[in-house]
Each structure stands twice: as structure tokens, then as C-alpha cells.
């Protein structure tokens, strides 16, 4: 039997300085790899210690963007035992690498939901279904998302307050964003953002030639660059902060729970599948949860708080008897409270406008080896930040300076991209003919994905139970482009028209931009470039920006909302919902930061209610 030997596989040996350098390189690579997905960065799983009948002060269902913040702040009171029940496990090493964001979809960290087929959207996706990834992992969707820290704008929150939700106007909630923010040096020296908060934020400015040209192109059409995102004056282009800490994703499970794992009253139970909330005489008493193959009944002395997200929170409410009466009765579920759970769902729709560019638009290498090396050695380069994805645009078709209704995100793919591009095409779920076209057109040239984004949708969808089996996924009807006056489609077509203007600017023309035409048989019957063509295009290739909200929305009237302005479920005691599902209307931007703000504000209200 031969013995493994390094000498056997190489023609010569390294000695002296060269050997030392080689060993240093290997050690650096191993150290970098071991820092990714390190379980020591997370709380120890308390699940094996839980027994049937155990009692806690607060039971928080879901350890995502909102739930992590809520549990952290509640556990500041050492007299309160706070249990977080998380359906998933710890985030993987892959999740720590920002540039591999799309590679996490349809893994064990993703619930991997899909919408039900509808005739208004997702028509050129496989099976006419859009993929709706949601985080099934400690940290929730902060483990899967694009790491963009976007607050929304003042008008969003003032509108919430105008609907009767006292205390949710911009002036009342902006302090909670500041409390969350920990902007890292050197940006912390000049930024108006907070510097001592829970979540590390990095200011990133892409040095790709095309990024600077995009900024110049916007200025050539009269759109200003904003040095910082300004919720009170949001129109313009801006580089938003990223939830990244020294090249690694800063998910809430790691930074907001893991960094406080020394608190003995903050308990995290992983792989804990909640089946229902136990309610007696309209008072929440606890939960039924499966942990380690055992079904346990746990008690909450004070409150049960649902922070399971805009899909799972309404599902659990309905399984527990809170929801639309007719739907629950048809499934044999006893009705506790007739409320519009799962209704009024909103989401940001995006489309895909791919532009082929000349080679001088990009600077980083053609192959995957150099970015990987750069990341593992220095945790820098394209994998550390998603390139120019944090360069955002907020615009308005109606010249309303306070409330943008569309904007743009951007992806930049190098020639024959083997890192981000394949993940995007697979993750979105295009039919093969479109995915192949996208790939083939970008083999020899870099491609810029200009992504029109619908920021103030009028359309609404809904979540419905498929059965009363908790393991059955709910039915997701996105409702995209179903508003009666087709305002959403009109705004998205206007966004394409804006793109066309932008491409014609001198700043972009120097790259010989060429719009890649996707093969869509239904749309190819129409005049290419007409409004009718682009409307057809939207119904076929538009997809989600992964921002479902409003399925347990906040309000005063029971027939139009699920929770009151203090996030208490109407007419059910000791039960709250604290996540993006409570938004009366979706904010005009990415929803991760607002979800964390909701968790923070909820903790303040809960403390007021129990300590006053």
C-alpha cells in the first residue's frame, strides 16, 4: 500500500524562502475558509434542552430580520426569558460570501416557494411560476438577500400614519434606524448614519468604468447623484450601504443574535417547526412545535410573537384559526377570529433589461479564479460586494419629488461569467430559451443588467392555505399586474423608456450598448419597441424583488387589517405580529432595513406595555 506523500505528486521540492511563502499562502487560504460559516459566531442551539410544558416569558417565532432584533432588545431585560424558535439551522459558509448570493436559492436555507400560475405575470418562467425564495435559516432572508440597507422614504411612513397608525410616521420611527446602524470606518467619519448600532454597514463604491459612466449618464439626463440616501428627498442615484462586515455578509443571526450569545436569557432553538399557536378563549397561551422529531407544547407567560415573515406568519395565523372565515371553515379549521389574514399582499416587481457592452466597460478578470483568489486572500474583489449592485436609482413618472414610483438596480456580468450570471439565471427561473440567450450573448462581452423596479405597486395578491397540514406550503397568488387601471404596467413601460434615453447618452454610447432581445413568441408578434411589446415583455419576464409584505397588515379597521398600531392581533390577547407582513403599504425600497426597524419599534412598545 502506498503512503500519501507530497513528494510523490510534484517533480521538485520547495526550500527556504519559497517554501515559507508557499506555506504562508496555504495558511492564509485555510484561515480565510475557516472564518466562513463558523458556528462559534452564532448562539448555541438550545433546542435539545427544551421539554414539553416548558414556559418562557416571550416566544418569538422566527429568527429573521425582525425577529432577531426583537429578541435581542427584549432580552435586555434580564428578568425575561426569551425563546426564539427558528425552523432552519445555521447559515452556511457560502452564505457569508456576498457574490454567491444567488447560489443559496433552493438549498436547505431556502423555503423555495413558488407562485401559483396566473395569466398576468411570470408567463416566461418555468411552469409560469415565479420563484419566491425566503430564508429558512437563522437570520431569515437576511442570509439570502442582496444586503442592501435602504430605509424607504419619509412619505412611506407618513402615509402609514395617515391611515390611522399613530406613531409610525417618519419623525417617530427614524430614531430606530439610527439605533440599528453601525457604519464602519472610514465612512463613519462623514456619514449621517448611526455608528454604534447592532448591525455593521459598509459603504461601497464600485470602481468599474461602467459604474462611473452610469452616474455620468444620469447627470446628462438631469438626475443628480446623492452622497447619502435621504428619506426626505429620495429622488436621484445613490450608493446605499451594504450589510457587509469586512467582506462577509452581516446577517442578523450572526450580528444581532450571535454577538449577544452570552445572555443566558436569550435562547435560540434551531430546526424548530412551529405547527400552531395555542389559543384559549382568545388569549394566546403558547405554541405547538416539533423539535428533534418530538411534538412539544410550550407556554408563553407574557406573549407569543410571530416574526416568521410575510408568507409563514399568515400561514401560522390561519392554521391557528385566525383568518378569513370561509377559507378556514372549508378546511375544517375552527375559527378563532375572522380577519383578512393573507390578503392585501404587495411586492416589488422587477424586469430584466440586458445590455451588451464593449470590453472597456469592465475591469476585473474574465475567469473565476482571480476573483476567488482575491476574496480568500483579502476578502476583496467582486465576490466581496456584488460589484455595482448597491448603486440604486429612485425616480418618479409623475415628478413627485417625495415618493418615487420606479427605480433601477444593476448587475454587471463579465464575459463568460461563471460566478454571478449562472446563479441569477437559475435563481429567477426563466424558461430555457431565454436563459440560453442571456448566457450566449454575454460569452465574449460584458453585460449590464438594467433592472427596472416597481416601487409603489397598486396590485395586490394573497396567501391562502392549501390544507390544514402545517407541512403543506400555502398557495401564493402574487397578483402582479392585476390593478384595474394597469398603472403598474404603465410605470414599468415608462421605466423602459427611461432606460432607452439613458442608453443614448454620450456617457454610455462609448461602450456601443446593444439591447439583448429575448425570444418571447407571444411578444414577437407585436411591433418591437412599442408600448404593447414592452407591456407583453413585462408580463412574461418580470419577477419578484423578494419583498413580499402586508399579509398581516397594520390598521385600525378589523375588516381591512390584522394587527393594530401596536402590532397586537385584533381581539386576540398576548399575540403580536412583528415583521414585514404588518406594513400597510410596501415601502419604496428594499425591505430588510424597514423589517429590522419594525422589530426594534415593537420591542419598545412591548416594554412599554409590560413595564408601565
Where are these regions (language model features)?
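N-terminal redox-cofactor-binding region of secreted/periplasmic oxidoreductases
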Residues: 1-612
Amino acid at each position: 500500500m502506498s503512503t500519501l506523500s507530497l513528494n510523490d505528486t510534484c517533480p521538485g521540492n520547495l526550500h527556504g524562502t519559497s517554501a515559507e511563502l508557499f506555506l504562508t499562502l496555504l495558511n492564509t487560504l485555510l484561515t480565510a475558509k475557516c472564518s466562513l460559516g463558523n458556528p462559534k459566531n452564532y448562539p448555541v442551539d438550545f433546542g435539545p434542552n427544551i421539554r414539553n410544558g416548558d414556559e418562557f416569558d416571550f416566544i418569538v417565532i422566527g429568527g429573521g430580520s425582525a425577529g432577531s432584533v426583537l429578541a435581542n432588545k427584549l432580552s435586555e431585560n434580564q428578568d425575561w426569558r426569551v425563546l426564539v424558535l427558528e425552523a432552519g439551522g445555521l447559515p452556511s459558509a457560502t452564505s457569508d460570501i456576498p457574490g454567491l448570493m444567488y447560489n443559496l436559492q433552493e438549498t436547505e436555507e431556502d423555503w423555495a416557494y413558488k407562485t401559483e400560475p396566473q395569466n398576468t405575470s411570470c408567463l416566461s418562467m418555468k411552469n409560469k411560476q415565479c420563484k419566491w425564495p425566503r430564508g429558512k435559516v437563522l437570520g431569515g432572508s437576511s442570509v439570502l438577500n442582496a444586503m442592501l440597507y435602504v430605509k424607504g422614504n419619509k412619505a412611506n411612513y407618513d402615509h402609514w400614519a395617515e391611515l390611522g397608525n399613530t406613531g409610525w410616521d417618519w419623525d417617530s420611527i427614524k430614531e430606530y434606524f439610527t439605533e440599528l446602524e453601525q457604519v464602519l470606518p472610514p465612512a463613519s467619519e462623514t456619514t449621517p448614519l448611526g455608528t454604534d448600532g447592532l448591525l455593521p454597514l459598509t459603504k461601497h463604491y464600485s470602481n468599474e468604468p461602467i459604474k462611473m459612466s452610469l452616474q455620468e449618464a444620469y447627470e446628462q439626463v438631469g438626475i443628480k447623484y446623492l452622497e447619502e440616501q435621504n428619506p426626505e428627498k429620495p429622488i436621484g442615484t445613490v450608493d446605499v450601504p451594504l450589510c457587509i462586515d469586512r467582506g462577509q455578509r452581516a446577517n442578523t443571526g450572526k450580528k444581532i443574535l450571535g454577538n449577544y450569545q452570552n445572555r443566558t436569557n436569550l435562547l435560540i432553538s434551531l430546526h424548530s417547526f412551529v405547527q400552531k399557536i395555542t389559543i384559549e378563549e382568545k388569549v394566546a397561551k403558547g405554541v405547538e412545535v416539533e423539535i428533534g422529531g418530538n411534538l412539544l407544547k410550550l407556554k408563553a407567560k407574557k406573549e407569543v410573537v410571530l416574526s416568521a415573515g410575510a408568507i409563514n406568519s399568515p400561514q401560522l395565523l390561519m392554521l391557528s384559526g385566525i383568518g378569513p372565515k370561509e377559507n378556514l371553515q372549508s378546511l375544517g379549521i375552527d375559527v378563532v377570529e375572522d380577519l383578512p389574514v393573507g390578503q392585501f399582499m404587495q411586492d416589488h416587481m422587477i424586469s430584466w433589461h440586458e445590455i451588451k457592452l464593449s470590453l472597456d466597460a469592465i475591469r476585473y478578470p474574465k475567469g473565476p479564479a482571480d476573483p476567488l483568489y482575491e476574496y480568500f486572500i483579502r476578502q476583496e474583489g467582486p465576490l466581496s460586494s456584488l460589484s455595482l449592485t448597491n448603486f440604486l436609482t429612485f425616480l418618479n413618472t409623475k415628478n413627485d419629488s417625495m415618493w418615487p414610483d420606479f427605480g433601477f438596480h444593476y448587475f454587471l456580468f463579465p464575459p463568460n461569467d461563471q460566478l454571478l450570471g449562472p446563479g441569477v439565471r437559475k435563481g429567477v427561473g426563466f424558461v430555457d430559451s431565454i436563459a440560453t440567450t442571456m448566457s450566449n450573448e454575454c460569452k465574449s462581452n460584458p453585460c449590464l443588467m438594467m433592472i427596472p423596479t416597481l416601487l409603489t405597486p397598486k396590485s395586490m395578491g394573497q396567501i391562502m392555505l392549501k390544507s390544514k397540514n402545517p407541512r403543506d406550503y400555502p398557495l401564493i397568488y402574487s397578483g402582479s399586474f392585476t390593478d384595474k387601471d394597469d398603472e403598474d404596467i404603465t410605470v414599468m413601460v415608462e421605466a423602459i423608456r427611461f432606460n432607452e434615453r439613458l442608453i443614448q447618452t454620450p456617457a454610455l454610447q462609448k461602450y456601443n450598448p446593444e439591447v439583448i432581445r429575448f425570444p418571447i413568441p407571444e411578444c414577437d408578434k407585436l411591433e418591437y419597441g412599442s408600448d404593447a411589446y414592452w407591456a407583453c415583455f413585462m408580463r412574461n419576464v418580470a419577477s419578484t424583488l423578494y419583498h413580499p409584505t402586508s399579509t398581516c397588515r397594520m390598521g385600525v379597521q378589523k375588516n381591512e387589517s390584522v394587527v393594530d398600531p401596536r402590532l397586537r392581533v385584533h381581539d386576540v390577547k398576548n399575540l403580536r405580529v412583528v415583521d414585514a407582513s404588518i406594513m400597510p403599504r410596501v415601502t419604496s425600497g428594499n425591505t430588510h432595513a424597514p423589517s429590522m426597524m419594525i422589530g426594534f419599534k415593537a420591542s419598545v412598545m412591548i416594554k412599554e406595555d409590560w413595564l408601565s
